[in-house]
């Protein structure tokens, strides 16, 4: 009986170590998100980081334009953005860049014409 208890414990520990974190983040990945990409690739330079642990504690390793580098992480609000069913006829400038630009529970969402603050999708 003692053998099977020990065996079961070892199996559970082995399997548990293979599961992703409860938050859905990879091991070593910091909370928060990367800011939206800031434009096209103009000049390619070597990556400055490969993962969040290589950045100061308030930053994340993010891909921006051509390479990965440490940038300030941004707050991500709960809920997803609603699906945009419209086709843009006249693109507008972005009304937000990140969730913290939006009031209350609203999220900064990509739409067919740009980014704007919207209530999160239900479901």
UniProtKB/Swiss-Prot annotation:
The keyword ATP-binding does not apply. The keyword Secreted applies. Disulfide bonds join 34-62, 41-66, 49-61, 55-70, 81-109, 88-113, 96-108, 102-117. InterPro entries: Elafin-like_sf, WAP_dom. Residues 27-74, 75-121 form the WAP domain. GO terms for cellular component: extracellular region. Keywords: Disulfide bond, Protease inhibitor, Repeat, Secreted, Serine protease inhibitor, Signal. Residues 1-24 form the signal peptide. It is found in: Secreted. GO terms for molecular function: serine-type endopeptidase inhibitor activity. Putative acid-stable proteinase inhibitor. This is WAP four-disulfide core domain protein 5. It comes from Lemur catta (Ring-tailed lemur). The gene is WFDC5.
């Amino acid at each position: 009986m003692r053998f099977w208890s020990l065996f079961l414990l070892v199996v559970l520990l082995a399997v548990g170590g293979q599961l992703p974190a409860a938050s859905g983040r990879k091991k070593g990945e910091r909370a928060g998100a990367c800011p939206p990409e800031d434009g096209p690739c103009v000049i390619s330079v070597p990556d400055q980081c490969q993962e969040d642990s290589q950045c100061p504690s308030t930053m994340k390793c993010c891909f921006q334009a051509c390479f990965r580098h440490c940038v300030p992480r941004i707050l991500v609000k709960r809920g997803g953005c609603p699906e945009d069913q419209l086709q843009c006829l006249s693109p507008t400038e972005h009304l937000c860049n990140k969730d913290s630009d939006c009031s209350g529970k609203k999220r900064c969402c990509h739409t067919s014409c740009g980014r704007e603050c919207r209530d999160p999708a239900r479901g």
